[in-house]
Curated annotation (Swiss-Prot):
Organism: Streptomyces coelicolor (strain ATCC BAA-471 / A3(2) / M145)
Domain Ketosynthase family 3 (KS3): start-end pairs: 1-402
InterPro entries, sorted: Beta-ketoacyl_synthase, Ketoacyl_synth_C, Ketoacyl_synth_N, PKS_Beta-ketoAc_synthase_dom, Thiolase-like
GO BP: antibiotic biosynthetic process; fatty acid biosynthetic process
Remaining remarks: This putative ketoacyl synthase lacks the active site cysteine.
Listed name of the protein: Actinorhodin polyketide putative beta-ketoacyl synthase 2
Keywords (A to Z) from UniProt: Acyltransferase, Antibiotic biosynthesis, Transferase
Amino acid sequence: MSVLITGVGVVAPNGLGLAPYWSAVLDGRHGLGPVTRFDVSRYPATLAGQIDDFHAPDHIPGRLLPQTDPSTRLALTAADWALQDAKADPESLTDYDMGVVTANACGGFDFTHREFRKLWSEGPKSVSVYESFAWFYAVNTGQISIRHGMRGPSSALVAEQAGGLDALGHARRTIRRGTPLVVSGGVDSALDPWGWVSQIASGRISTATDPDRAYLPFDERAAGYVPGEGGAILVLEDSAAAEARGRHDAYGELAGCASTFDPAPGSGRPAGLERAIRLALNDAGTGPEDVDVVFADGAGVPELDAAEARAIGRVFGREGVPVTVPKTTTGRLYSGGGPLDVVTALMSLREGVIAPTAGVTSVPREYGIDLVLGEPRSTAPRTALVLARGRWGFNSAAVLRRFAPTP
């Protein structure tokens, strides 16, 4: 059974919607800049990937506005766009034949911080009743399923930056178990003081003040990453079911998925990223020689970049495959990062061009990777590998294949 991606919805700092985002990525235009939603002058980090051109009332019903955090509003919008793109009308499909699987790493930080201020300053009676679910990691799954009447198997996953790929992998398993269509992906937003402090506490956030030089994975100047908001929601379908409803094309196939967990620090055992890569390739029934491009996790932290480069090198050989990190144009989007990379990979497969790693210029020779720099690289890729790692040991990998219509 093939699991196809038939629709995508993108909400990114450098583009709302697929076409603006893809154009920005190819041009190397980033959406990074100073945080403007609160005063960051007292904080060591001041840059983020903000979505500044999103006006929620233009995209979701007014009744949902008081119920939802910014991350959920973005997720609902992306889901709407993905379903429209897939030409899938939920009202014409059986409710139990549609599921929702999303990932979330931050929860409803903005909503909850606001309600906590009310609690502390005005008392418990001032707290919104919607706080009971607006903060929760599973809220995007719930709101999407309610909005579109999707009553099939649904769930939520939490694995920081790796969670979005995990969600897509679980959606694929759900389809293979008999659910014809699953809406899946990840969106995060935590650009409020409470969320900002939590992110800075990781010790991995860039303190640079120049957006052009703040997030440089695999570069000699790498010194942390820039966090961002947004992500992507995708429509995944069983190929036969998609064709039965009249959908005869797709962005590509989700051919393989795998997740691993790193051993305890100091154990002496190897990290799990290489194993995740090999498991995903095995799941896809393909070998390293068939992979045409790797969309790397690209932590932007020197020791993490070096570890990822070693894992890629052990699987593919020194400079054995083109590698790219288009997320330098958006920042790291936590659960939204993996699904957005999947969309970028699918577009690369469809358009025959590998998106570049914007901003990076000086890759240490010892990394031994063929990083795509400066300009898009025109090729004819057929298979892509997407990687993601989350704090505390999460590793995920996904294999994508170019769509091949049935003769």
